[in-house]
Amino acid sequence: MKKLLILNGVMGAGKSHFIKENKLEDFTLSSDELRIKMAGFDMSENGLVISQKKDRQVWSTLYTILETRMEMGLFTVVDAMHLRTRDFKKYKELADLYGYGIYVKRFDVTIDELLQRNAERESYNQISVDVIVKKFEVFTNQVLPDYVTVIN
């Protein structure tokens, strides 16, 4: 069966590190990389941050590229947080259409570890502490859809 791997975790949980460590860059679609390419950076009180201004276009583009890859039967990894159950809906539609299994790699990291990693990031890639805490709470309470297979 053809495989779609969805990475699932809060910012700083190790998703991008996992991609590099496993040499998956050529198979990966990253919402943050598309944000940088489309909208660049914004200035915040702490310096540069990845712009969220074109988020709708970012996701439209990501889904277009993903569908093209799935039409061709290619293994694909999607690097984004995927914190809400509804975040998986489009993947389900495409998986059903093209005969893919959906696999989810969860990055379950403590809040202390997330905050430490955030502090060590480049300034443009840092997130405010309150945002990390909120995203962590959402992740902790998340129920994944029953049509995905969780892998370790």
Question: Where are these predicted regions, by residue range?
Answer:
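Short beta->alpha linker loops
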Residues: 33, 82-86, 109-110
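Charge-rich, low-complexity amphipathic helices
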Residues: 41, 84, 91-92, 113, ...
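Glycine-rich phosphate-binding loop used to anchor ATP phosphates in small-molecule kinases
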Residues: 52-102
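Conserved GTP-binding G-domain of TRAFAC-class P-loop NTPases and closely related GTPase folds
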Residues: 1-8, 13-17, 21, 25-27, ...
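Short, catalytically relevant binding-site loops at active-site mouths
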Residues: 11-13, 35-36, 83
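Short N-terminal micro-motifs specific to bacterial/archaeal maturation
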Residues: 1, 25, 49, 53, ...
